[in-house]
Regions:
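Structural recognition of alpha->loop->beta junctions
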Residues: 33, 37-51, 128-160, 165
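Short, charged, surface-exposed secondary-structure boundary motifs
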Residues: 63, 125-128
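Active-site alpha/beta core segments
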Residues: 1-88
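Generic beta-sheet signal
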Residues: 9, 55, 117-119, 148
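A short glycine-rich beta-strand->turn/loop micro-motif centered on a GG-aromatic cluster
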Residues: 90-93, 113-125
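Histidine-anchored nucleotide/phosphate-binding helix
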Residues: 98-111
Length: 165
C-alpha cells in the first residue's frame, strides 16, 4: 500500500536551553527530551508509519517551526515532504501564535498548500489577541483555515481510504 506520510512534530529540548527562562529565554522548561512532557498525548493515535520530526534539539535553538526539525535519520521536514512529492500540508497543534504560526508561514514560503485546523490549535496568548493575529497572518500568507470535519471531507473517502492530495 502506498501511504502518504503522516508527520508528527514535537519539541524535544535539552535539559539546559536558551529557550527556557533559566537560560535567558521566554519559556518555562517544557518538552524536555525523553520526559513525559515531551511525549505525544496518549489519545493521539499515530500509525506505525508516522515520521517523527523533533525540533528545538540544540541548547541555543528555539525550534518554533517544524521546518527547523529533523527526523531520526537527520532528514529535515522539507526534504521529507519533497522526497514524497507532497504538495500540501495540514497543520494543527500548539501553540497557534508560535509553533503553528512559524510552521505555517514556512510551509507557505516553501510553496505548500497549507490547511490550518482551527479546532485543533490553541494559542498561548501572552497578549489577548495573539492567537487571532496569528490566524490572520497565516490566512494572509495564503493558508486555508478549516475545521477538522473539513479535513475529514478533503482527505478521507467514504470507504475510509485516503484521497490523493
Amino acid at each position: 500500500m502506498n501511504h502518504r506520510p503522516i508527520v508528527a512534530t514535537r519539541d524535544w529540548h535539552p535539559q539546559t536551553s536558551s529557550h527556557f527562562t533559566s537560560g535567558g529565554g521566554r519559556w518555562p522548561p517544557h518538552c524536555v527530551a525523553d520526559s513525559k512532557g515531551a511525549a505525544f498525548h496518549q489519545d493521539l493515535l499515530l500509525p506505525a508509519h508516522t515520521i517523527v520530526v523533533s525540533k528545538g534539539l540544540q541548547p541555543n535553538e528555539n525550534g518554533y517551526s517544524a521546518f527547523d526539525g529533523i527526523d531520526d535519520k537527520q532528514t529535515s521536514l522539507l526534504n521529507i515532504l519533497t522526497a514524497h512529492s507532497i504538495e500540501g500540508v495540514v497543520v494543527c497543534g500548539l501553540a497557534t501564535d508560535y509553533c503553528v504560526r512559524a510552521t505555517v508561514l514556512d510551509a507557505r514560503r516553501f510553496g505548500f498548500s497549507t490547511f490550518v485546523v482551527v479546532d485543533a490549535i490553541e494559542p498561548v496568548n501572552l497578549n489577548d489577541t495573539d492567537g487571532d493575529e496569528a490566524e490572520r497572518e497565516m490566512q494572509d500568507a495564503g493558508a486555508q483555515l478549516v475545521d477538522s470535519s473539513t479535513v475529514q471531507r478533503l482527505f478521507v473517502q467514504d470507504d475510509g481510504s485516503h484521497r490523493r492530495r
